[in-house]
Amino acid sequence: SGTSVSASGPGDSASGSSALKEGEISQPEDYFDLVFDTSQDQGKLTARYLYLQTIYGTGKEAVTTGDSAVYTSPDGMVMLVDCGNVPGGQEVTNQLLAMGVDKIDVLVLSHPHADHVGGFVTVADNFEIGQVYVNGHEYDSGTYRAMMEKIEQLSLPCEVLEAGDAFSLGEEVQVQVFGPTPGDTEEVAGGYLDANDGSIAMRLTYGQSSFWTSGDLYITGEQALTETYGQDIASDVVKMNHHGKDTSNGKDFVQAMSPKIAVGMFDSVASRTVAMRYIAGGAEVFYNSTD
């Protein structure tokens, strides 16, 4: 079903797994209903990290993949970050409908890889979308072209986010953008942009609580952030970079982030080293496939 985290008020800290009470974490009998029950959302900034069960690959290479998270502001504004892979778009749609969503106020596409933007066409066909944000990096793939064609077909407002930008989600949630760096078009081997390190990095803040998301940033991208911002990127809740893999979530990044809660978007523990790194830093670790 997924993992839900809420910040209850301007003076409260974030609590995990749709906590029933302040700071209480539990696994109820009907976990799906609690994760997608929005009756307790009012007055909270809530993040739901969706579990997409679509299988990619075969045999030992088969993995459940796709990345998508929903943030709901205290006054009911909805922001979707990424849409999963192509077949996962229907799963994202179904889970949004289970929440009673009929409009996505803000849709952020962190970077143009298929497991993050592939489901966009299906989502866009099912919901009104107020604003789309992208990282501005073009990508040579069918899913990227389909995404851009759908944006044009529906005449959706679409803007590029870069470090230094900021916007609001409702009246009380501020979103600060830390990456990618303006004009960051450095090419890597083969002449292609490093799509993962071009991921949009941003922090949502509500009162004293903060939520971080930065797509599939590699350790190189994380180092650029820590060298530029240091402890200024610290956040209460972090979605682990690159699904919690050890290509990302380096020691310096985890230390700078110092989260209370870390969420991995994968069908298992992608890296025990990464999980233990967050735990050693004082975080509770959750995976959207099991928690």
Per-range role (PLM):
Residues 74-79, 86-137, 228-245, 258-263:
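Active-site metal-binding motif and surrounding structural segment of the metallo-beta-lactamase
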Residues 94, 117-126, 141-148, 250-254, ...:
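Metal-dependent catalytic neighborhoods of phosphoester/phosphodiester hydrolases
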Residues 1-3:
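Sec-dependent N-terminal signal peptides of Gram-positive bacterial secreted proteins and lipoproteins
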Residues 9-103, 152, 160-233:
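Core dinuclear metal-dependent hydrolase active-site scaffold
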Residues 131, 138-196, 261, 266-291:
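Binuclear metal-ion centers of metallo-dependent hydrolases, dominated by the metallo-beta-lactamase
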Residues 86-88, 112-117, 139-142, 165-168, ...:
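Active-site environment of divalent metal-dependent phosphoester hydrolases
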Residues 228-229, 255, 279-280:
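Short, solvent-exposed amphipathic alpha-helical segments in soluble enzyme
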